Amino acid sequence: DTLSLHDALPIYYCTLIALHKPPFFEEKHRIVWREIEQVKEISEIKHPVVRAVMDHMNIQRGLEIFYQGDLPARTGLGSSSSFTVGFLNAMYALRGQMSTKEQLAAEAVYIEREVLKESVGVQDQIAASFGGLNRINIHPDGNFDVHPLTISPIRSNELKSHLMLFYTGVARNASEVAEDKIKKIPGKKAELTEMQKMVDSAT
């Protein structure tokens, strides 16, 4: 199993608004992000996650989608997976359906890895779906267990007061970074074993 300790800190946000679009317009869908897209078909959408999720969920009605994020892309803080999870959740909400955290995480992984063919891990999608401080066990078959860690507000504030976060301005592609990490795993077994022990001692 792969173990990791994750804390989804409520510092930065991505805001998604999804509405059904009246059927009176020539363009069926309008997506506002870095670009403003107005298209007739899902296949014409440039935003890869929006296109993949709408196709995956077989969206029939026209949509207006507005996205605003506190972070630029490719910061390494999980903003892409947060968007995927949030957009899936919004699509279910438009259907009047509730989705479980497990389902959101699994579908986000499927969209990013199987549909978009990105070489990414699964921790970010799980962290975005569950939120909070968790011990995540990822099994060889791809299934996972999430164990929330309950700590007092005093201990939580103490932990956060000892963390520092810096923006370097360096953009990186998560898929490329993951590919490089996978190649180096055979030579890093001792370090990875030690890191796994740290998760055990922390939880």
Model-derived features: where do they sit?
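Helix-to-disorder regulatory junctions
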Residues: 66-67, 80
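Short, small-residue-biased leader/transition segments that mark boundaries at the very start
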Residues: 1-9
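DPxDG-like acidic metal-binding loop motif
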Residues: 77-97
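Short pre-catalytic strand/loop immediately N-terminal to key active-site residues, enriched for Gly-Thr
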Residues: 71-75
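Residues at or immediately flanking beta-strands
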Residues: 62-64
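Short alpha-helical patches at coil-to-helix transitions and adjacent helical residues
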Residues: 2, 47, 81-85, 129
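C-terminal nucleotide
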Residues: 6, 13-59, 68, 91-94, ...
